[in-house]
């Protein structure tokens, strides 16, 4: 047992003052508060740190020389987190995250926290909690070797404005609830729940990390009194130091839920004191755009009396699991990781750090020698070393599934050209060029879109593909290489070519075949629109076949370079189902206009499939003025040629899809419900003939979209750092008692 006297404890003192005002729309009641002085992390009566964990016999000890530094993942005042590769032993080649802390920079309380973090990680084994593989120390530093989680942290995702719909939040909160419950069952209060401490693995599941502020051995009938955690996420009983139990974590879960759903914190004043007073007394303004179930859960988590808080009762987490907000969650499947996460990081190189903050990953990884600590520091960390007992067994029995051959061949600094061989051009645009490429190791063929970042910000396109590319009819993003001026997006190769090419090459084509094609495309567009995504460039050249089968299932919607995601006033993503009170009317109008443009493009495609020529251009030599005049008139022919043989039902659908007024145009949902689509198996099998040469039809189609592109300038897609949310959270250092 190692003991510390009061003289060894650091005490940065402050007072909680009485405030009577209205801040950010929150009314603060004029009630006197007890003035107290306390340390940022006053451990109170907890003066002894038990050392009960030891290195398991027979396991190999680790040291810094066994790990190759690859990249910097994060940095604080006490040290850094590196991406490393194990160089020797049964797990050679395995990637880990290495947390390096400088002993000399750690005050006594911080050393206690670090030892506590190591002890907790040794004890914990849970699918949603980060795993500790090794722990060791040198004279000047402490090392924790942890899981490397390629998805980055939720804070980075939030600051990039990806997520969060209520369905997304429901999934992440459910996994967090299981992780917190596991800690509570071990007598551990987490006490520092915030987006920065929630990581995403390569499949998109969460992993809770950073246990430096957690408190062990707190039973339900006992309380801790230390003032630890990030202020904005603190429960009232932590702020007023009247003692707290595991129930404090459920308040923090509510804060996290509120922030993920709204992009703002529920209690945040102009300074630390005001924030704490708001936590203690301010009334919470409940956003009305949230569902009743979400509002209900927030109210039950934001109970200032911890004994009344959801999860504090004798049933614990079961109270939370039974809440109607989680009614669609299968908790057993969730625990077994059988439910599909709402977001999956782009798959690619095992050491890919695209999801991490470039502020850190751009730095050269260097682990400088640590300054020797004070004389008693080594005694403090006695028993710190650890090797996970399962590390050796796992490495013997299981292949390193997350290590691709490319890592072993090319190492950590592999560039696109190290991994892929460029071949011929596939397509050339204003901001990018698309080429075929071959993986140098597997010889598999892919396509790569090379984007000039000086001409266009690719962030939105990458985020959309990462988020929605798992849909079977949306092109799949395989890898991302960010190399200075250019970004390389590696995708599956569309070997079947353009949809229109394939159709026009067929001598005969029936309504039934056309309806099957339109159904597949419209179903995909409807999925995107329901998620608040508009493509805005659905010309036929962006709809391709994955293979030569001609099967509608192999159709892929490609090129999301001009796609947009619906965002609220705070910059967060939304779905159209709950935006009325959260988005400016002109934004909704613009979104509706863009969605209507997507349907218009599908109408042009349908017209061309049935007629064999385009509706508004007679040939590739038509001028933009002529084409725009015809489009603006809203008139197109539905008589003569194939139209004399085409069903009235198809003509009715076309007239609604090509309606000149976007407000009267069909939505994707309405297209799918139209009888020509809903009863497509009953459509005529009559073979429609082709009269015009395919190259003339394609030329006319290109002229149509060229005219449209000249009519309106494409919007400039600014970096996400310019958004209101990114600016609001730009500091990357929420006021924290941890000071790190």
From Swiss-Prot:
Residues 327-396 form the AGC-kinase C-terminal domain. One of its GO terms (biological process) is TORC1 signaling. One of its GO terms (cellular component) is nucleoplasm. InterPro entries: AGC-kinase_C, Kinase-like_dom_sf, Pkinase_C, Prot_kinase_dom, Protein_kinase_ATP_BS, Ribosomal_S6_kinase_II, RSK_N, Ser/Thr_kinase_AS. It comes from the Eukaryota. ATP binds at residues 73-81, 99, 426-434, 449. The active site is at 192 (proton acceptor), 537 (proton acceptor). Its cofactor is Mg(2+). The keyword ATP-binding applies. Serine/threonine kinase that may play a role in mediating the growth-factor and stress induced activation of the transcription factor CREB. Belongs to the protein kinase superfamily. AGC Ser/Thr protein kinase family. S6 kinase subfamily. Forms a complex with either ERK1 or ERK2 in quiescent cells. Transiently dissociates following mitogenic stimulation. This is Ribosomal protein S6 kinase alpha-6. It comes from Danio rerio (Zebrafish).
């Amino acid at each position: 047992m190692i003991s510390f006297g009061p003289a060894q404890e650091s005490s940065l003192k402050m007072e909680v003052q009485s405030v009577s005002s209205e801040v950010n729309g929150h009314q603060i009641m004029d009630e006197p508060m007890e003035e107290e002085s306390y340390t940022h992390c006053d451990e109170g009566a907890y003066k002894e740190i038990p050392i009960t964990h030891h290195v398991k016999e027979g396991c190999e000890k680790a040291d810094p020389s066994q790990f190759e530094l690859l990249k910097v993942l994060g940095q604080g005042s006490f040290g850094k987190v590196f991406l490393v590769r194990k160089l020797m032993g049964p797990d050679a080649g395995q990637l880990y995250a290495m947390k390096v802390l400088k002993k000399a920079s750690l005050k006594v309380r911080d050393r206690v926290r670090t030892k506590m973090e190591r002890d907790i990680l040794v004890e914990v084994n849970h699918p949603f909690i980060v795993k500790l593989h090794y722990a060791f120390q040198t004279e000047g530093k402490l090392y924790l070797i942890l899981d490397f989680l390629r998805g980055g942290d939720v804070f980075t995702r939030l600051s990039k404005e990806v997520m969060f719909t209520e369905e997304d939040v429901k999934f992440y909160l459910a996994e967090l609830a299981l992780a917190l419950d596991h800690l509570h069952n071990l007598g551990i209060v987490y006490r520092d729940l915030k987006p920065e401490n929630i990581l995403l693995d390569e499949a998109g599941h969460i992993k809770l990390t950073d246990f430096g502020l957690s408190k062990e051995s707190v039973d339900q009938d006992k309380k801790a009194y230390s003032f630890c955690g990030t202020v904005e996420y603190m429960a009232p009983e932590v702020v007023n130091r009247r003692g707290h139990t595991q129930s404090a974590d459920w308040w923090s879960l509510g804060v996290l839920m509120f922030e993920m759903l709204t992009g703002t914190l529920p209690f945040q004043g102009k300074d630390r004191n005001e924030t704490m007073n708001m936590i203690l007394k301010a009334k919470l303004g409940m956003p009305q755009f949230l569902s009743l179930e979400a509002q209900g859960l927030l109210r039950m988590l934001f109970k200032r009396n911890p004994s009344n808080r959801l999860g504090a009762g004798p049933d614990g987490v079961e109270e939370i699991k039974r809440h109607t907000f989680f009614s669609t969650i299968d908790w057993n499947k969730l625990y077994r990781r059988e439910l599909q996460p709402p977001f999956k990081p782009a798959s690619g190189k095992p050491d890919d750090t695209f999801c991490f903050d470039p502020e850190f990953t751009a730095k050269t990884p260097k682990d400088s020698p640590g300054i020797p600590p004070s004389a008693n520091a080594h005694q403090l960390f006695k028993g710190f070393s650890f090797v996970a007992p399962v590390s050796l067994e796992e490495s013997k029995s299981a292949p390193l599934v997350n290590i691709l051959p490319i890592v072993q061949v090319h190492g950590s600094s592999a560039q696109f050209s190290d991994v892929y061989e460029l071949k011929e051009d596939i397509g050339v645009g204003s901001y990018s060029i698309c080429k075929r490429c071959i993986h140098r190791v597997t010889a598999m063929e892919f396509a790569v879109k090379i984007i000039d970042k000086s001409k266009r910000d690719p962030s939105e396109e990458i985020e959309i593909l990462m988020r929605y590319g798992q849909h079977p009819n949306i092109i799949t993003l395989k890898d991302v290489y960010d190399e200075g001026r250019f970004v390389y997006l590696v995708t599956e190769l569309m070997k079947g070519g353009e949809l229109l090419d394939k159709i026009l090459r067929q001598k005969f084509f029936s309504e039934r075949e056309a309806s099957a094609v339109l159904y597949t495309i419209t179903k995909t567009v409807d999925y995107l629109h329901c998620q608040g995504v508009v493509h805005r460039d659905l010309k036929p050249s962006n709809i391709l076949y994955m293979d030569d089968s001609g099967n509608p299932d192999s159709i892929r919607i490609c090129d999301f370079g001009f796609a947009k995601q619906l965002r609220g006033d705070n910059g967060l993503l939304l779905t159209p189902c709950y935006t009325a009170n959260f988005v400016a009317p002109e934004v909704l109008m613009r979104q509706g206009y863009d969605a209507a443009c997507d349907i218009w493009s599908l109408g042009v495609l349908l017209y061309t499939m049935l007629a064999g020529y385009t509706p508004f251009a007679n040939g590739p030599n038509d001028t933009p003025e002529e084409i725009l005049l015809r489009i603006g008139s809203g008139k197109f022919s539905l008589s003569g040629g194939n139209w004399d043989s085409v069903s009235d039902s198809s003509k009715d659908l076309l007239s609604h899809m090509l309606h000149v007024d976007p407000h009267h145009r069909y939505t994707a949902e309405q297209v799918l419900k139209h009888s020509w689509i809903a009863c497509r198996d009953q459509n005529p099998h009559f073979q429609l003939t082709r009269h015009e040469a395919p190259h003339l039809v394609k030329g006319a189609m290109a002229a149509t979209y060229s005219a449209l592109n000249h009519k309106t300038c494409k919007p400039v897609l600014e970096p996400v750092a310019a958004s209101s949310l990114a600016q609001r959270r730009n500091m990357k250092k929420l006021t924290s008692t941890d000071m790190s």
